[in-house]
Amino acid sequence: TQAVAEHLMVGETAITQGMRDAVANASAGAVFFHWPLEFPRVFHRGGFDVVLSNPPWERVKLQEQEFFAVHDAGIAAAATKAIRGGLIKGLADSNPALLQAFEEAKHDAEASSQFLRTSGRYAKTGVGDVNTYAVFAGLGRSLTSPRGRAGIIVPTGIATDNTYREFFAEVTETGALASLYDFENREKLFEAVDSRYKFSLLTLCGEKQEEVQFAFFLTQPSQLSDK
């Protein structure tokens, strides 16, 4: 817990074998990844020269219907949230293992959301109804060296949604934004994405850019070469 961590840092609590085991188990389950520890030479030089990312576009908050669509179609298809809630409670008798799996998934999602909101690493992207695409946009920027660039495929909401206004204002005002190419999916560049959905090729850089390139309402990458 946070309280235990604070006591450990000031030497008021001894590290027990039980604590070591708990940390090892948590690490195995959460699959912790620390970029500077994994790539010490890269970060000794300031970061990556090139970062390319096509991150997931998903809400961190657990979606009940999505979870049960995989595990129990009947619950997923419930007509209302209230009915679905009753069916979930009923799992305590009919399928306690599934209920436990649901509660664990819900806890993991809430813990992830809490970390993204409060850790300080994602101050401008781990906000609102936290979405992974914004988190990855912020991460891509933080991994990039002063001379490097990060290219990320994200929903255009990174630039237009009120939730991320502080992030986009920061990359614009500091000169970290190199380009934003906005696409509509009317020609189904992404088959699984709704045709009305808008996404962008976002390029961020370490060095301050004097000029920024923008394009909007594109439908094909070939249009980027149009003058």
List PLM regions with ranges.
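Conserved helicase NTPase catalytic core signature
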Residues: 1-40
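Signature of N6-adenine DNA methyltransferases within the class I
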Residues: 33-227
